[in-house]
Amino acid sequence: MEIQLRNYAHLGDALWEVIVREYTVDKAVNAKSLHKMTTERVNAKFQHDLLITIDELLTPEEKDLVRRARNIPVPIGRRNIQSEYRMATAFETLMGFWYIHNKDRFEEMKDLLNKKIIF
């Protein structure tokens, strides 16, 4: 059974939230700062920027997955910019895809994002 791209994105969205929360849980001094640190990183603009940052590290197959995921028809909220939202969906799709099919790559990118990019 083949998994649809939107299902990878759904999983990737949850994974990204957990990654950020794991990192921020011991960094914040109170609930307000914890929420602020998390929401600054769990949003379409931030994920769009991350995908652009890691683009040069992606394999041709991963870049093809990004291209296909950008074109998934998804509802876009009023406050989101369409191009950013589509790139964020592609980022989430990559995270979900790696988690299901290539745990080593998932861990590699998770470590890179934690150490060098997001914090």
Regions found by a protein language model. Name each.
Residues 1-119:
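Double-stranded RNA-binding/processing signature
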